[in-house]
């Protein structure tokens, strides 16, 4: 986060047909197209297909409701994952949530929103950030909603064994503008600094009285 921050426009390094949201793949490739006009139609078709898939997934996410039998359904967080190995990609629901927030804020038609994507206009973020999966073994401890320090358990028992807890954390990049100030701020008149901010997610933890349970803890979620 950054006070008095404003984006600075620069030349885009993305192609006009690039998709800004990984994790979903559309069918078709541009090598089978015969000419410039066909290539343009192909890019439009791929973008439309991508939008259609996104809309379907968002609709399905709204329809799905946790059943009464699944009492742990509400413990799930988009930035927490239980897995036997390190996840290879960002969580899909996290990507959908980020995209949905952008759509809600834009309040435009899908086609207009696509062309107003900051990645297409060549805009850069005020602060650079990096995201990665972090294990409970790396976190070890965290602060819960009451301000107490709790131990983050590395493994979660499941019917067929144990799974590890992984947290998808986002923090300010150590390179670039993190130390020099926020991008787009006139240094002659303003002092600025990019800082990592935190949010609460639910995780399996143990307090100082050895009581194990699901609690909200703070993790790094933005810059």
Swiss-Prot record:
Signal peptide range in chain numbering: 1-5
Propeptide residues according to the Swiss-Prot or TrEMBL record: 6-114
PROSITE patterns in the cross-refs: NGF_1 (PS00248), NGF_2 (PS50270)
Record: glycosylation sites: 107
UniProt record, GO biological process: cell surface receptor protein tyrosine kinase signaling pathway; modulation of chemical synaptic transmission; negative regulation of neuron apoptotic process; nerve development; nerve growth factor signaling pathway; neuron projection morphogenesis
Functional description taken from the UniProt entry: Promotes the survival of neuronal populations that are all located either in the central nervous system or directly connected to it.
Family recorded in the similarity comment: Belongs to the NGF-beta family.
PANTHER family in UniProt: BRAIN-DERIVED NEUROTROPHIC FACTOR (PTHR11589:SF3), NERVE GROWTH FACTOR NGF -RELATED (PTHR11589)
Protein name (database record): Neurotrophic factor BDNF precursor form
């Amino acid at each position: 986060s950054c006070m008095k921050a404003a984006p600075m426009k620069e030349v885009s390094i993305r192609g006009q047909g690039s998709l800004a949201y990984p994790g979903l793949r559309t069918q078709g490739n541009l090598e089978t197209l015969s000419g410039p006009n066909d290539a343009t139609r192909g890019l439009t078709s791929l973008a439309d297909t991508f939008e259609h898939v996104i809309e379907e997934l968002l609709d399905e996410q709204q329809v799905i409701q946790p059943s009464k039998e699944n009492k742990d359904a509400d413990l799930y967080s988009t930035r927490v994952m239980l897995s036997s190995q390190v996840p290879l990609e960002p969580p899909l629901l996290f990507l959908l949530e980020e995209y949905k927030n952008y759509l809600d804020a834009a309040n435009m038609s899908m086609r207009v929103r696509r062309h107003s994507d900051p990645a297409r206009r060549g805009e850069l973020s005020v602060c650079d950030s990096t995201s990665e999966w972090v294990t409970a073994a790396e976190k070890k401890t965290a602060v819960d909603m009451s301000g107490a320090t709790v131990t983050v358990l590395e493994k979660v028992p499941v019917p067929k064994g144990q799974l590890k807890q992984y947290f998808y954390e986002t923090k300010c990049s150590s390179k670039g503008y993190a130390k020099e100030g926020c991008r787009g701020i006139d240094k002659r008149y303003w002092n600025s600094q990019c800082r990592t901010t935190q949010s609460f997610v639910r995780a399996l933890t143990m307090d100082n009285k050895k009581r194990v349970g699901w609690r909200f803890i703070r993790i790094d979620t933005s810059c």
